[in-house]
């Protein structure tokens, strides 16, 4: 049964949870003008990557990427699945630690950080244990409830902007390509597309609808960066942590029954982030379960969650989180580039092999 709508919504929600928190600060910090250029480059890379990835997956209609790599040989499985698993661990650790820090700063300043991390990880682990269909059903429900709210807040955040701050529109050079913060910004692209290769054949979808979902994300990539700049100016926006969240704090909606729009905005994004963490845990568990079939997947998932929680406890402060995002850059680009390309070329080889056998 085609479930393209569910996959589209999951693709949107997992990316939105990454875009509004971390992406604006990295892009604003990478250049002092013409921010649309690094944004557009990232979006182009995003579309190229998911197009190649889904084209490669289309050669294997009933296979997930674990089976694809295992079919290619033990060496291919180790070369690609081992870094992917490590990447899942790292992004889960960073997501749990970063989002818990945000919750602690904005809502629960007197609550111990470890308890927030435990709660966030518990909910995500519970969802992952229920399986991919439960995660997707939860995603559809959250999309129905929260996507209109996110859209409303995004558009009402234009109320305090000054278009003068958008100039200059052109950059004399491309120095942002050498800035670590720009490479960190690809976290918003690299973590959210891999699940498309794990859900086959349980959940089927149409490629063009996923591209449509990616197209729908483009305004949010732009808004998340430009609204803080147009509100505060580049010189001020570059000094802010979570600049879009700060902008939301300035929004005044007279007909809204609650005083703090920020609270609902952040709670919405936190629910999206829990979906992202849960699907990341589920993917990591799928790979490890395939390698260790003698251990029940549920116990493996618990072990993964414990490792992630202990790792989060070992991160002392927010600066260390930023350093981990930076140190993770080579692995991030390895996954972003090598997985789609390898799936595509393995798919071409598989197609030729099947064609020869039929002839």
Predicted regions and their residues:
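Extracellular/periplasmic helix-loop-helix junctions in multi-pass membrane proteins
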Residues: 292-299, 312-334
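Membrane-interface interhelical connector segments
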Residues: 232-261
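Membrane-interface loop-to-helix entry segments
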Residues: 99, 114, 127-157, 328-340
């Amino acid at each position: 049964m085609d479930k393209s709508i569910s996959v589209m919504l999951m693709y949107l929600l997992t990316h939105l949870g990454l875009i509004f928190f971390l992406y604006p600060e990295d892009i604003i910090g990478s250049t002092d003008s013409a921010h649309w250029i690094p944004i557009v480059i990232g979006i182009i890379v995003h579309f190229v990557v998911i197009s190649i990835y889904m084209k490669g997956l289309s050669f294997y209609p009933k296979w997930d990427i674990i089976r694809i790599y295992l079919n290619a040989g033990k060496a291919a499985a180790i070369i690609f699945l081992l870094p992917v698993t490590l990447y899942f661990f790292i992004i889960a650790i960073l997501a749990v630690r970063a989002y818990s820090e945000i919750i602690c700063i904005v809502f629960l300043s007197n609550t111990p950080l470890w308890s927030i991390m435990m709660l966030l990880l518990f909910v995500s682990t519970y969802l992952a244990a229920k399986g991919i269909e439960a995660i997707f059903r939860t995603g559809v429900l959250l999309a129905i409830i929260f996507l209109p709210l996110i859209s409303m807040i995004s558009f009402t955040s234009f109320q305090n902007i000054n278009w003068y701050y958008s100039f200059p529109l052109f950059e004399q050079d491309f120095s942002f390509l050498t800035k670590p913060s720009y490479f960190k910004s690809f976290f918003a692209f690299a973590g959210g597309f891999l699940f498309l290769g794990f859900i086959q054949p349980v959940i089927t979808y149409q490629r063009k609808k996923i591209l449509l979902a990616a197209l729908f994300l483009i305004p949010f990539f732009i808004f998340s960066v430009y609204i803080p700049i147009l509100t505060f100016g580049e010189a001020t926006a570059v000094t802010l942590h979570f600049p879009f969240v700060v902008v939301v704090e300035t929004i005044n909606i007279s007909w809204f029954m609650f005083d703090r729009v920020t609270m609902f905005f952040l709670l919405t994004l936190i629910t999206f982030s829990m979906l992202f963490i849960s699907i990341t845990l589920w993917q990591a568990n799928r790979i490890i379960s395939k390698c260790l079939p003698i251990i029940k997947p549920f116990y493996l998932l618990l072990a993964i969650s414990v490792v992630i929680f202990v790792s989060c406890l070992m991160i002392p402060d927010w600066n260390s989180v930023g350093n981990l995002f930076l140190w993770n850059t080579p692995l991030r680009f390895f996954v972003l580039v090598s997985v789609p390309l390898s799936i595509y070329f393995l798919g071409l080889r598989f197609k030729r092999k099947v064609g020869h056998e039929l002839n």
